């Protein structure tokens, strides 16, 4: 009889340790999960801040036209000398569209930033101080190519 009580006592103590261990493991996992989500949030915030700066900084402005990365505006680093030449303007427009898709989901991730990008890109494309591609019929095609309505 004594042996049965001893065995039951050992089983109860073992069970209590298992329960405590399960509770501790679950608690530890919840704490770890909270820290991970906080770290993820902090990381996202930091990344967003960096991207926000990257997306609208001055060197980015020149890369909208591709002048910093391609030969489309080879006559002038500031893009001002296209002379409204159709081939050069087509190259610049293609660079802008390529840049748009390169930045998709990074800089351009909602309707508002999409419109900001398109407006800014169109100014660079059409303004005589920048690329000087002033064909007004191209504006709607240019805006249509960068379909902001999909957001």
UniProtKB/Swiss-Prot annotation:
Its main location: secreted. It is found in: Secreted. Residues 1-16 form the signal peptide. The keyword Signal applies. Keywords: Pheromone, Secreted, Signal. Residues 17-52 form a propeptide. One of its GO terms (molecular function) is pheromone activity. It comes from Euplotoides octocarinatus (Freshwater ciliate). This is Mating pheromone 3. It comes from the Eukaryota. InterPro entries: Mating_pheromone_EUPOC. GO terms for cellular component: extracellular region. Mating ciliate pheromones (or gamones) are diffusible extracellular communication signals that distinguish different intraspecific classes of cells commonly referred to as 'mating types'. They prepare the latter for conjugation by changing their cell surface properties.
């Amino acid at each position: 009889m004594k042996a049965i009580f001893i065995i039951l006592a050992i089983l109860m103590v073992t069970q209590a340790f298992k329960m405590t261990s399960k509770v501790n493991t679950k608690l530890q996992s919840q704490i770890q999960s909270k820290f991970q989500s906080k770290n993820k949030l902090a990381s996202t915030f930091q990344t967003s801040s960096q991207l926000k700066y990257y997306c609208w900084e001055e060197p980015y402005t020149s890369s909208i036209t591709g002048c910093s990365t391609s030969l489309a505006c080879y006559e002038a680093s500031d893009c001002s000398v296209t002379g409204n030449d159709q081939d050069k303007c087509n190259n610049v427009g293609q660079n802008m569209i390529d840049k748009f898709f390169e930045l998709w989901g990074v800089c351009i991730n909602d309707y508002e930033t999409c419109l900001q990008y398109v407006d800014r890109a169109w100014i660079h494309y059409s303004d005589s101080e920048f690329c000087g591609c002033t064909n007004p019929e191209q504006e709607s095609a240019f805006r249509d190519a960068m379909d902001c309505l999909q957001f």
